[in-house]
From Swiss-Prot:
Cofactor(s) required, per the database record: [4Fe-4S] cluster
An annotated GO BP: light-independent bacteriochlorophyll biosynthetic process
Organism: Rhodobacter capsulatus (Rhodopseudomonas capsulata)
Catalysed reaction equations from the record: chlorophyllide a + oxidized 2[4Fe-4S]-[ferredoxin] + 2 ADP + 2 phosphate = protochlorophyllide a + reduced 2[4Fe-4S]-[ferredoxin] + 2 ATP + 2 H2O
Protein name, entry field: Light-independent protochlorophyllide reductase iron-sulfur ATP-binding protein
Length: 304
């Protein structure tokens, strides 16, 4: 049996003749997630989105919110600092029941993590096959069928890398606000510029708007701030390159479970401020930046 034999028929998804899968509108797209406020976290691969998402979810929970975090990466490591372990993905659990979701119970694919944060790993199809957008859609449908979104105040989507194809842009179809994690360097800012363009394209037909960016693992923010000024964007948080954050990952914990060192307390406070800012942002007009051309970015941030 090949890996492709495990992939269900992707209704509403057609190949383009070049080995890829393109996403088209279908009944699965734009599912209502009830009254929850939905945030989708994007950024260059390896920039720290999962660390940001998990600590953000923890911060929301400490503000008294009922939180659900959904990891949208085949690595399924988005939530392990919240749960202390790697959990099975929705797509793998669906395979076990031959893609009959009616046979599943919430406890089969939802794990309770730090301070009551509910954790789900959507996973993804085998490399080179299927579509991540299908997996996200099926995960949201499953959560709705089990009425898990009705008792949730905040949903955080932690999305794979800086991929801006239709499949991994699927969380944008459910989100109120998109948050971009970047660093104070050319490559991650270049990726952020592309993500901004993708979000702006989705915002034509969906409610998603940009909330701003987080300068992550960066001592300075001058390059991020220069880009934001040029693109009419906004940095809403700064997470320095702290060894305590790396240690928390190694210990499989959020920052809120670490010892009260000075830098840990500072980082916790910044995550609480970020959560408060994002919560308020859904009641305000979203940002409307203008993505820069490649030439403009090179002239602004590139080497002389």
């Amino acid at each position: 049996m090949s890996p492709r034999d495990d992939i269900p028929d992707l209704k509403g998804f057609d190949g383009d003749g070049e080995g890829s899968v393109q996403v088209h509108d279908s009944e699965d797209i734009g599912l209502d997630v009830g009254g929850a406020r939905v945030f989708s976290v994007y950024g260059q691969g390896g920039i720290g989105k999962s660390t940001t998402s998990s600590n953000l979810s923890a911060a929301f929970s400490l503000l008294g919110k009922r939180v659900l975090q959904i990891g949208c990466d085949p690595k399924h490591d988005s939530t392990f600092t919240l749960t202390g372990r790697l959990q099975e993905t929705v797509i793998d659990i669906l395979k076990q029941v031959n893609f009959h979701p009616e046979e599943l119970r919430p406890e089969d694919y939802v794990t309770e993590g730090f301070n009551g944060v509910m954790c789900v790993e959507a996973g993804g199809p085998p490399a080179g096959t299927g579509c991540g957008g299908y997996v996200v859609g099926q995960t949201v449908k499953l959560l709705k069928q089990h009425h898990l979104l009705e008792d949730t105040d905040v949903v955080v989507f932690d999305v794979l890398g800086d991929v801006v194809c239709g499949g991994f842009a699927a969380p944008l179809q459910h989100a109120d606000r998109a948050l971009i994690v970047t660093a104070n360097d050319f490559d991650s800012i270049y990726a952020m510029n592309r993500i901004i363009a993708a979000v702006q394209a989705k915002s034509v037909n969906y409610k998603v708007r940009l909330a701003g960016c987080v300068a992550n693992r960066s001592r300075e923010t001058n390059e991020v701030d220069r880009y934001c000024e040029a693109a009419n964007f906004k940095r809403i948080a700064h997470m320095p390159d702290l060894d305590s954050i790396r240690r928390s990952r190694l210990k499989k914990r959020t920052l809120f479970e670490m010892d009260d060192a000075e830098d840990v307390v500072m980082a916790r406070a910044e995550y609480i401020r970020l959560a408060e800012t994002l919560w308020r942002s859904t009641g305000e007009p979203g940002l409307t930046p203008e993505p820069l051309t490649d030439r403009h970015i090179f002239e602004l941030l590139g080497f002389d």
